[in-house]
C-alpha cells in the first residue's frame, strides 16, 4: 500500500474541460427525446401562470447577437419561473410579412408582374417559412426551451383571422377612417410607412432663403415688400400654397442700403440673416406681431398664377431660418394641418417612385425629386428671388428597410385614430411597470406626440385590409363583413382575398345601400406589419387557452418603444380597453467593441454560431448575464474569452465539489444541521444568503447581479476560503469521520443548490453536473429552485451577531494572510504549511474566536498556532487593528501524509514519518500498515 492510498482523494468523471460545442448538441438531443419542455409544463399543471409573451423577430436571415441577447434573456426568465412554482409556457413567434421578403424574391429573380398576386404571395410564404426554420434552429442551439413545434407566425390563418377581428373591434369604435394626409412615403418601397418604420440619419440638404413679394398686405405691408422664406427642400416649392408664421413672434420690416426692396423676417433673426445675405446698413422700418400678418397674400416666386396665403401656426420658431416657413399642404404634416384651417388646396406634385409630376410644371415633370432641387434653385435665381443658398446639416427620415430617404406625401390612406383614445391609452399605461423606470415616460411621451396611425400599405405580402367598396365608391366595413372575412381567413388563409372576387368574399345574400345592383370591389392595400405583430395579444394570448391576457411580461430591445410596445398598446386598448402587458422590460442594442453598430458591410459582426462553435452556447448565455443589458452592449471576442475564464472557475469548483462527494450518500451519510461543525454550519448559512439574494435578482430580472454574486460566491466564499482549507479535512480525516461527513454534507448541499441556481443560465452544464448528483429528478430542469428554508433549519437561523462575528474573523484571516505573504517574501517560510503563528488579540477578538468555536489553525492552513493577549505582542510582530501576528518557521518535521510540520512526527513508532493525528487515523482504518509498512511509490 502506498501512503496516498490512505488519503481520501476525490474522484469524478466530470471533466475539467467542458467540450461544450460537442456535448451541448448531445444534451439537446436528449432533451428532445425526453420532451423536456412538455415534461416541465405537465409538472407545473395547476400552478399559477407566468406568461412572457415573445415579441416576434423578423423572419429574414440568420440570428445575430441581438437575437441571442434577447432570446437567452427570455429563456433565463422562463426557466427560472418554471422552477419556482409557476406554469410558464413560452410560445415563440415570428413576424413573417412585409417588404423585405418581397425584395428577397425580387433579388432571386422572380418578376412579380409575370405572375398573379396569389402566386407571388405563395412564394413569399415559402421563403418566410424557410427563414423561420433557419432561425428556429439557431435559437434551439442557444439552448432556448420553448414550444418550438407550435410557434405563432403572423402568416398563420388563425393569427390573420384574429388580426382582422381586432381591426373590426376598432372599426366598431369609429377608430378606422380613410383620409388624404401627408404620410411618410418611401419611394424606394413605393409605399406609405408608419413612424415605427422610419429611422433618422444626419444628411446635408440644399437650404434656400428666398423672397416672395406681397400682393395684398392687408394695410400692414406694402407691395414692394418681400417675405423672406426658408426651406431645406427646394423641390417642394412647386407644391407651396402658403407661408406659415407664429402669431406671437415679432416680425421686422427692414430695408438694406444695398437693395431696393423691403423684407420681412423675425426681428430676432435680422442681424444674423443680414450678415448671411450680405445686406449693408439695414434699416428697421417697423415691427409687427405675427397675428397682424394673418391672411396677407404674396406671389409665388415662379408660378405666376399662384398666390400664397400667410397663415398662423404653432410649429414656427426662431431657432433657425427666418421665422417664416414655406408651406406645401400635400408634402408635409404640419403644412397639411395648418393648410386645412385655411382651406388651401392639397397639391402632390410627386409620384409613387419619387418623380415630379406635371402638377409641378413642365420644367419639373419626370425629374427625380432630389434632382428637382437644382431646378427650383435655378428658377429662384432667374426670378431674382434667391437671397442665399447654403448646405444645411440636419436629421432626416429614412426607410429602415431600404436605407433610402423618405418624403412626406399626401395620399389616400387608411388610418387608425390614436387621438380618439389617447387619454384612454395613457390611463392604462400608468398601471404598467417598466424596467428601466424611464421606459414609462418614454412610451407615454411617444403616445402623446404621435399622430393617427397610417395602417395601409401599398404592397401585397401582408394581411389585406378587410374593406369593400360599393358602387358609389363608399367604403363598407360592418361587423358582418369583417367577421365573415375573419372566418374565411381562419379557414383558408388570407390568400383567399386575392383568389376570389369581392362578391365571393362577402356573406351570402349581403346587400348594401351603396350597391343597389349588388356590385362590389375590394381594397387592394394590406395592413402595416406593425398592425400584424401589434395584435399578437389577441392572435396568441387570447387565442390559446393555456396562455393568459394580459401578459405578465414583454421584453424587447429599446427600439420597440416606437415599435411593438407601441403598436401592441394601441391595438389592445382600442380592442379590449386594457394594456396587453403588466410589465415591460427593455434592453439596449448590441454594438461592436468600439461602440459602433454591427453590420456585414463594415465587417464588424460576431455571429452567435461563431462563438458557439468554438466555446459553446453556455458561454454565450453566461455572457448575457455579465452585461448591463438595460443599456447598449458591446460585443467582442475578448469579452467571450473573459467569460470563458469565469466559466472555467465555476466548472472547476463544481468538479471539486463532485469529486469530494463521490463517496457521500446524502441519504445515509448526511449530518444533521445541529451536529454540523461550526464552519460548515456557517457555510450553509452563507449558501442560504447567497440563494436568497440570487433568487431576488432573478425575480427582478437583474442578471448582472446574479453573475456578480455567482462569481463572487465561487471565487471568494468557496475557492478562496472554504475549499482552500478543505483538503486537510476531506483528504486527511478518516473517510467516515463526523468532521469529514459534516463538510461533505455542506459540499453536497452547495453542489445541489448551486446547480439549481445556475440552471436557467447554464442549462447544458447544469444537466451535466446533475448526472453526478444523487437526486430524485432525472433532469435538473424538472427540479425546483432551492427554497431558503430548505438550506437552514428554521429553528437554526443564526442570530444577528453571527455574520458580524464571521466578518470579524475574515478580517483577521486577511491580516494573517498578509503576514504569511511577508514571511514568504522574506524567505522565512516557503508556504503557509511551514509556518507557526502567534496571534495576539484583544478581548473582543478572543471572545469572538471562542464564540465561533472553529479550528483556526486548520482554516489558516498553518502547522502551529498559539493565541495570546494583544498586550503581550513582541515589538517585531506585525500589527493590525485588534491583532498582532508573528510568523515563525514551524518546529518539527514534515508529515509524509498531511504535509504539515509537526513536532510529534514519529511519536508512533509504526509510522515514523507520520504526525500523531495521521498515525492514529491510519492505524484505525488501515491496521495492516502498522506491520506491513508502505510501498515507496
Swiss-Prot record:
Role of this protein? Catalyzes the attachment of isoleucine to tRNA(Ile). As IleRS can inadvertently accommodate and process structurally similar amino acids such as valine, to avoid such errors it has two additional distinct tRNA(Ile)-dependent editing activities. One activity is designated as 'pretransfer' editing and involves the hydrolysis of activated Val-AMP. The other activity is designated 'posttransfer' editing and involves deacylation of mischarged Val-tRNA(Ile).
The protein's organism comes out as: Levilactobacillus brevis (strain ATCC 367 / BCRC 12310 / CIP 105137 / JCM 1170 / LMG 11437 / NCIMB 947 / NCTC 947)
Cofactor(s) listed in the protein's UniProt record: Zn(2+)
Where Zn(2+) binds, per the record, is at: 895, 898, 915, 918
Q: How does it assemble?
A: Monomer.
Q: Which SUPFAM superfamilies match?
A: Anticodon-binding domain of a subclass of class I aminoacyl-tRNA synthetases (SSF47323), Nucleotidylyl transferase (SSF52374), ValRS/IleRS/LeuRS editing domain (SSF50677)
- Please give the biological process terms from Gene Ontology that the record holds: isoleucyl-tRNA aminoacylation
- PANTHER family from the UniProt entry: ISOLEUCINE--TRNA LIGASE, MITOCHONDRIAL, SOLEUCYL-TRNA SYNTHETASE
The keyword Aminoacyl-tRNA synthetase appears for this protein: yes
Could you tell me the EC number(s) of this protein? 6.1.1.5
Q: Where along the chain is ATP bound?
A: 600
> Can you list the GO cellular component terms from the UniProt entry?
cytosol
Read off the InterPro entries from this record: aa-tRNA-synth_I_CS, aa-tRNA-synth_Ia, Anticodon_Ile_BEm, Ile-tRNA-ligase, Ile-tRNA-ligase_type1, Ile-tRNA_ligase, M/V/L/I-tRNA-synth_anticd-bd, Rossmann-like_a/b/a_fold
This protein's name: Isoleucine--tRNA ligase
UniProt-recorded Gene Ontology molecular function terms: aminoacyl-tRNA deacylase activity; ATP binding; isoleucine-tRNA ligase activity; tRNA binding; zinc ion binding
Which keywords does this Swiss-Prot/TrEMBL entry list?
Answer: Aminoacyl-tRNA synthetase, ATP-binding, Cytoplasm, Ligase, Metal-binding, Nucleotide-binding, Protein biosynthesis, Zinc
